[in-house]
């Protein structure tokens, strides 16, 4: 299940003309703040780009942190989209986001299949971290 905030972002993206979609992706990339000092990030080795993630649960809400080089705006945009879903949601809602949540919304035209597999791996890594946080 795709959380409402993420679904709304995906629907907006799908409704835009193709020439505006890259602009919207860059806006999502710009929304990704640097992780706070001391947050231990895990590298997503399946990604070609150095992509580091961290998820935890505080106050019943999922918190997500990312580090993506500025030289990788499409990967950073995907991180920005991920923040629209599991971040701030209940752990259960975050765990329900399917790895291929982006399919059918036009994102396939912006990411290569190899990159999409890496980004799906990032979501799965985040979900594993949420599960671990729930059992700690």
Predicted features, each with a name:
Residues 56-73, 83-87:
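Conserved interaction-surface patches within small, structured recognition/assembly domains
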Residues 10, 80-83:
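Amphipathic alpha-helical segments within well-ordered protein domains
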Residues 2-50, 57-60, 103-136:
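N-terminal intrinsically disordered, cationic/polar leader segments
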Residues 88-105:
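Glycine-rich phosphate/pyrophosphate-binding loops
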Residues 30, 83-87, 99, 131:
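Generic short alpha-helical segment signal, independent of protein family or function
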Residues 41-45, 66-70, 92-97:
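Solvent-exposed interaction patches of small proteins and small membrane subunits
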Residues 71-79, 91-94, 119:
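Short, charged, low-complexity patches
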């Amino acid at each position: 299940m795709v959380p409402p905030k993420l679904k709304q972002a995906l629907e907006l993206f799908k409704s835009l003309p193709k020439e505006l979609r890259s602009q919207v992706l860059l806006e999502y990339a710009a929304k990704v703040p640097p992780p706070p000092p001391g947050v231990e990030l895990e590298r997503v080795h399946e990604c070609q780009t150095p992509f580091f993630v961290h998820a935890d649960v505080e106050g019943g809400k999922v918190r997500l942190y990312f580090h993506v080089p500025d030289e990788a705006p499409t990967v950073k945009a995907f991180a920005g989209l991920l923040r629209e879903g599991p971040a701030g949601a209940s752990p259960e809602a975050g765990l329900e986001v399917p790895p291929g949540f982006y399919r059918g919304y036009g994102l396939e035209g912006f990411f290569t299949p190899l990159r999409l597999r890496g980004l799906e791996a990032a979501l799965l890594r985040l979900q594993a971290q949420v599960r671990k946080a729930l059992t700690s």
